[in-house]
């Protein structure tokens, strides 16, 4: 589980006029807090009741909403509340002991399908964490048949909308074609550090 790339999120917000963010996989709430420092409205979806209640107890900020449930079930209704393009930080997968989702370890393709059904999908940004887990069978204790391949992730991202797709470090990036120069600028900046 990597951290939300804040500088990239800011660049995309400014370039594309994004005013909201959605995170799948709250875990300890760091990602939600980081996104809230960039966006006025943030929703973070968590399947583990223990992690959800801990985040609700320990983290509070105006415009930040924690949502309990399966991202696959929650996203369609949530997307009706978001009237503009958004940044999606997709990190809602089973990560071993202390996390939820062992029955469906990686609902990523279903999350993408839910986002793609939204009228704002063509202008939204999808940042998918843990790209390394799609390059081959994930390590134990994961069930390989629960995880899509990198090609199936990329194919799903291309199915309904024209997007610029790339990988950077441990992240799949899917943005509207107009944001390609933003991604290239981010690459150059990060690569020189």
PLM feature spans:
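A short alpha-helical cap/connector motif
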Residues: 1-87, 93-193
């Amino acid at each position: 589980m990597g951290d939300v790339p804040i500088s990239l999120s800011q660049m995309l917000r400014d370039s594309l006029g994004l005013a909201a963010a959605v995170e799948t996989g709250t875990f300890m709430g760091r990602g939600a807090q980081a996104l809230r420092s960039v966006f006025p409205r943030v929703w973070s979806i968590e399947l583990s009741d223990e992690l959800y209640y801990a985040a609700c107890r320990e983290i509070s900020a105006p415009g930040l909403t924690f949502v309990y449930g399966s991202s696959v079930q929650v996203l369609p209704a949530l997307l009706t509340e978001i009237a503009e393009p958004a940044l999606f930080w997709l990190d809602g997968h089973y990560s071993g002991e202390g996390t939820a989702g062992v029955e469906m370890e990686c609902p990523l393709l279903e999350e993408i399908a839910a986002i793609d059904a939204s009228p704002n999908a063509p202008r939204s940004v999808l940042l998918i964490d843990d790209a390394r887990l799609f390059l081959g069978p994930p390590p134990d204790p994961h069930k390989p048949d629960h995880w899509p391949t990198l090609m199936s992730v990329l194919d799903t991202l291309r199915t309904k909308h024209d997007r610029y797709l790339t990988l950077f470090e441990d992240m799949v990036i899917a943005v509207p074609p107009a944001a390609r120069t933003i991604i290239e600028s981010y690459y150059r900046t990060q690569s020189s550090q």
